[in-house]
Amino acid sequence: SSFVGNVWGVGQSLHVVGEEYKPLPEAIEIVWLSFTENKFYFVSEWLPKNRLQSLFDTVWMNVRKIEQRYNGLVVGMAPYGMIQIWAVGDGRRTEVCCLHGPEVPVKMSEFRPRAIISQDEYVKSTIEDEPRVYENLKKNGLPDSLLFENYRKRFNYHIVPEIEMEDVDLTQIAVHYFNGEYDVILWERLKENLYSLQA
């Protein structure tokens, strides 16, 4: 069990056991507590093998001209039983897949074996530790589930940077996308001016 952070797409809780390099996972099984809903969800699914293999076979050059590859996975858990999985590497975070699972009953004693407070108290105290989130939920409630799906919609982007400062030698640009993806684009690659589908 682990408490995870609240930055979409950014891994904040790390679990590594055994050998340094491992085969790509075939499936995921996870139970989590959605604090904003005070509900447990469960996902048990096969992962898209070809997509994972394709991503982990991808090689790119970083700003120091060193070959890079994806070297990890990040799992994000959202309300309404949604999880999103990203492949991560130096300067890149790319969506692998999005999965959904049902609400499930979980006893607090199973979730936090030494808990001395109820699930409701635990959820309330955890959310109150994030004042901006807490106030926003009180004021606006939880967004519709379509919001999370809409964040994943891809559009054909064509990035054309305009630099106002003179004598600036840019080597890269960092782009954060709504679906949690992230890309550090080398200036040479950006000058190719290719269109790409991004969320």
Regions found by a protein language model. Give the residues of each.
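A eukaryote-biased signal for long
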Residues: 110-199
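Tryptophan-paired
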Residues: 2-34, 173-199
